[in-house]
């Protein structure tokens, strides 16, 4: 048997392997170029971009927790115009699909961002963040109400012909209802899960540790929740699902594929090991070789229940 085929396709975007980087954990790509080969991963997903630059939340805004971390960065970013002028030129030189994550505080901002990105051939697709739990206005509302989510996705769909991935929040009662609303509105793929809203308290000070009070929980602690939600959504929709949540190893990634994910995103692992995404992709290839599996796509949704 020759080398196994790790390629997958998500919303018309061809990936050399199923491993993408999760937004907010990989900067704009260049920051990690010294630590791994950007042409050995499936796709680069940028930090979440807004219309105007954003300073983010006051510190402290990160705290380690058992099995993960809480972050309340507050979607700090350079803004869409600076991204296009300063960050995109480097990404043009990399032969790996670039997917831009975007978020707005209003419906109109989502549409405006999509229109600006629609004209850029080097942007392979958009990932719409309707689910970030640490912003005091905007995202949380869109991400937890099916009608609001439908409105946002519909507007972005009208504003671009690019492949459209919608990132879902786990902070909902019925994730399948949210998934269906986004697909009905025109999503080409769904990525899940974003972080779970959490809190950490300092007993001595009797105060929250994070200046923002609450933050997003990520890392291995959320993996069982993520697997369950990916499995539920993958059975309910006809578009590709991208699994996110506590993926630290190739084993984790392959478990998400069995649950129904076509691709995965690596997030918190990038902070612990900046070469994690490449290491996970290589580990997946090794697993296929050792188990005589010719094509990684054989594993998608192959969970025996």
Curated annotation (Swiss-Prot):
Entry's cofactor comment: Binds 1 FMN per subunit.
Single GO MF descriptor: dihydroorotate dehydrogenase (NAD+) activity
UniProt xrefs under CDD domains: DHOD_1B_like
Major location category of this protein: cytoplasm
Domain of life: Bacteria
Binding locations of FMN: 23, 47-48, 101, 129, 167, 193, 219, 245-246, 267-268
EC number: 1.3.1.14
Cofactor: FMN
Gene Ontology BP term (one): 'de novo' UMP biosynthetic process
GO cellular component, one term: cytoplasm
Catalysis performed (reactions): (S)-dihydroorotate + NAD(+) = orotate + NADH + H(+)
Pathway: Pyrimidine metabolism; UMP biosynthesis via de novo pathway; orotate from (S)-dihydroorotate (NAD(+) route): step 1/1
Protein role: Catalyzes the conversion of dihydroorotate to orotate with NAD(+) as electron acceptor.
PANTHER family reported in the protein's UniProt record: DIHYDROOROTATE DEHYDROGENASE (FUMARATE) (PTHR48109:SF1), DIHYDROOROTATE DEHYDROGENASE (QUINONE), MITOCHONDRIAL-RELATED (PTHR48109)
Protein name according to UniProt: Dihydroorotate dehydrogenase B (NAD(+)), catalytic subunit
């Amino acid at each position: 048997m020759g080398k196994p085929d790790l390629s997958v396709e998500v919303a018309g975007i061809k990936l050399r392997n199923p491993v993408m980087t999760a937004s907010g954990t990989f900067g704009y790509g260049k920051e990690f170029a010294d630590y791994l080969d950007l042409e050995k991963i499936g796709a680069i997903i940028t930090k979440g971009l807004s219309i105007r630059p954003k300073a983010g939340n006051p510190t402290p805004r990160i705290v380690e927790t058992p099995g993960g971390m809480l972050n309340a960065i507050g979607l700090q970013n350079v803004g869409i115009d600076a991204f296009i002028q300063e960050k995109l030129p480097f990404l043009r030189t990399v032969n790996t699909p670039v997917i831009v994550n975007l978020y707005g505080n209003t419906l109109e901002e989502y549409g405006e961002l999509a229109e600006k990105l629609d004209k850029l051939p080097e942007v392979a697709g958009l990932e719409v963040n309707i689910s970030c739990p640490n912003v005091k206005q905007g995202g949380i509302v869109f991400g937890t109400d099916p009608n609001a989510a439908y409105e946002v996705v519909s507007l972005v769909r009208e504003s671009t012909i690019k492949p459209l991935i919608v990132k879902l929040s786990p902070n909902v009662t019925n994730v399948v209802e949210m998934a269906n609303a986004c697909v009905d509105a025109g999503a080409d793929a769904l990525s899940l899960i974003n972080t779970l809203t959490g809190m950490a308290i300092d007993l001595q000070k009797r105060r929250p540790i994070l200046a923002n009070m609450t933050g997003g929980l990520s890392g291995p602690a959320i993996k069982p929740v993520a697997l369950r939600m990916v499995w539920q959504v993958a059975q309910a929709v006809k578009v590709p699902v991208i699994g996110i949540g506590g993926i630290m190893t190739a084993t984790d990634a392959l478990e998400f594929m069995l649950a129904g994910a076509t691709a995965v995103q690596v997030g918190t692992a990038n902070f612990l090991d900046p070469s994690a995404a490449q290491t996970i992709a290589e580990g997946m290839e090794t697993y296929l070789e050792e188990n005589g599996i010719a094509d990684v796509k054989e594993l998608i949704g192959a969970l025996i229940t």
